[in-house]
């Protein structure tokens, strides 16, 4: 609901602004009042469509192997994590909507934290989301090329900026969660390695014991 509220307020303010600047009122931008209002809704819808196209293209057209979480582009360092902590991401991240319900994979919680196969799927969704929100944040500036030039500063640029600030918080949250998930993933790997080593040692001990029993039996014979 937060994004809907932000977009609704932004569109309403821009519609009023461009209506006021139109020929029907102050005559600043050189378009009719009706066109000023219609162009506002057109630009907002265009930004939404650009975001939707990017999301659909990335998820449906690009190979999943491009979004492997261990690639450098998806790796989050300690310095980046500190940046997210400085902007108090923990206080507001839960107020930003999570779009997993549209993909069939909810990221609201980690259902199986000790299952790395599950975490791999979770990572894939994070990497998809990071890419989509990062590209969408800047692709929205295409609106500047697709709206009347006389409305560049009163409409196109504000819409592009609002679109950017609607995408960047989600991008930050996904990156922050990715750092924490990587720690969990590595801990699971270490635990699995310890268990494998323990099982290997147990098998070796059993083999030695079995060999000793056979040796005693052979000596008795």
What is the role of each PLM region?
Residues 119-151:
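Transmembrane alpha-helical segments and their cytosolic interface motifs
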Residues 38-89, 164-168:
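Hydrophobic alpha-helical membrane-embedded segments
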Residues 1-53, 120, 172-179:
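Cytosolic-side membrane-entry/anchor segment at the start of a transmembrane helix
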Residues 169-206, 221:
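Cytosolic/matrix-facing juxtamembrane and C-terminal tails of multi-pass cellular membrane proteins
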Residues 63-118, 122, 195:
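Membrane-proximal soluble regions of multi-pass membrane proteins
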Residues 12-13, 45-49, 98-101, 130-140:
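Hydrophobic alpha-helical transmembrane segments of multi-pass integral membrane proteins
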Residues 41, 156-157:
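Hydrophobic alpha-helical transmembrane segments
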